[in-house]
A protein has these predicted regions:
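Catalytic phosphate/metal-binding cores of nucleic-acid and nucleotide-processing enzymes, i.e., regions
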Residues: 1-111
Length: 111
């Protein structure tokens, strides 16, 4: 079973090959940190619940989860609701294949 990191890395690689002129980038909010590092990052503006990836040109945030067992936290759910309320799209994907299918479906709607 692939980790969320592996699934996300695969998605970013596929996306950059498929849509080379469209920027996608990661928001490294997650992960274990020391209390001092967490405090410093919070002071710099890191906020709990921000999705893993952003595609500015499409106004699309992507929350990656593992295929099995990946759950959206309360903070993530609240952030997703906020982002949608201000006009962004938010996608929750269970692994690379799910994310790829959702992105392709979204692009088919636009075209």
């Amino acid at each position: 079973m692939k980790t969320e990191h592996e699934e996300q890395r695969e998605l970013v690689r596929w996306f950059r090959q498929t849509y080379p002129g469209t920027l996608i980038f990661a928001i490294p909010n997650g992960g274990a940190r020391s209390p001092a590092t967490a405090s410093r990052l919070k002071a710099e503006g890191v906020v709990k619940g921000v999705p893993d990836l952003f595609i500015p040109a499409w106004e699309l945030w992507i929350e990656m989860k593992r295929v099995k067992g990946g759950l959206v936290s309360l903070e993530q759910d609240a952030m997703h609701a906020y982002l949608r309320s201000v006009g962004y799209q938010v996608m929750v994907a269970k692994g690379f294949e799910d994310a790829k299918q959702q992105i392709e479906a979204l692009r088919n709607e636009v075209e």
